Amino acid sequence: MIISLRVANDNTSKEFIKETITKYHSYVPSTSSVGRRIDWVVFNDDVPVGMIGIGSSVYPPPKDILTHTKLSMKEYKDNFNSFASNWRFCMREKIKNAGTQILKELRRQAPLYWKQKYNDNLNYLITFVAGGNNGAVYKADNWSQIGETAGLPKHKSVSMKWDSKESLKEKYVKTTGEDKKVILCKKIEHNQNTSTSKSK
């Protein structure tokens, strides 16, 4: 088994990713996202078997992110582009021990392509895990579980990242715990290999 990640730069890989999410993601079969985005196709011995992607972080952030990173809201906002959210991780088949290999390679490639595409240093990866999952694959890669979201009714679980303070007040929805997510975070170590040559 040789696991590799290749950035989705062509229509074929993008269609593969769209189909993978739509057909195989267990609880959020949506391919839409807001803001920045870089996706990879996951290969096992040169056979495409899944996808993983990162995108813009969340705003406003859950307080657990601020507590873990020791940042104020203003500092987080000023450093917003140094955070990325692992917005999807979806496999078409179960492959033993593949998860940690994929996440390790993501940590190697993500800061390189983030810098290349957006000219920002990537310092933190975060992810939100729901659907009854506890984030075991992330924990096996030494991500820290830093908290949980309060949970919104599923029909109200939408991004309000770009709303003003006034519109946020209008859209306020009482938390219910219905769609609670586990929050995990991984600090990027910038002394990792700085070459993208391993990606094909």
Regions found by a protein language model. Give the residues of each.
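Conserved beta strand-loop-helix elements of the APE1-like EEP
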Residues: 181-192
